[in-house]
């Protein structure tokens, strides 16, 4: 169980770094999804499954829709940083 929590922590940090290091939102979303899934998995491992489920549903139900809308408005897959 300790290795699983450590793995989720590493996935969360990698996801956050992936969001911070990508100038294009097309590729930053992969890190964002990885960080949210790892964070919800971390909450599940702590025993607060209802909170993890609610955060997962709210995030993927609302925040990802707003993100897709903003990506559609940006429409520049390879920006020059």
Curated annotation (Swiss-Prot):
Keywords: Electron transport, Membrane, Mitochondrion, NAD, Respiratory chain, Translocase, Transmembrane, Transmembrane helix, Transport, Ubiquinone. This is NADH-ubiquinone oxidoreductase chain 6. Its main location: mitochondrion. It is a multi-pass membrane protein. One of its GO terms (molecular function) is NADH dehydrogenase (ubiquinone) activity. It is an enzyme of class 7 (translocase). Core subunit of the mitochondrial membrane respiratory chain NADH dehydrogenase (Complex I) that is believed to belong to the minimal assembly required for catalysis. Complex I functions in the transfer of electrons from NADH to the respiratory chain. The immediate electron acceptor for the enzyme is believed to be ubiquinone. Pfam families: Oxidored_q3. The chain crosses the membrane at residues 1-21, 27-47, 48-68. Coiled coil: none annotated. Its EC number is 7.1.1.2. The keyword Transport applies. InterPro entries: ComplexI_Subunit6, NADH_UbQ/plastoQ_OxRdtase_su6, Nuo/plastoQ_OxRdtase_6_NuoJ. Gene3D superfamilies: NADH-ubiquinone/plastoquinone oxidoreductase chain 6, subunit NuoJ. It comes from the Eukaryota. Belongs to the complex I subunit 6 family. It is found in: Mitochondrion membrane. One of its GO terms (cellular component) is mitochondrial membrane. It catalyses: a ubiquinone + NADH + 5 H(+)(in) = a ubiquinol + NAD(+) + 4 H(+)(out). It comes from Anas platyrhynchos (Mallard).
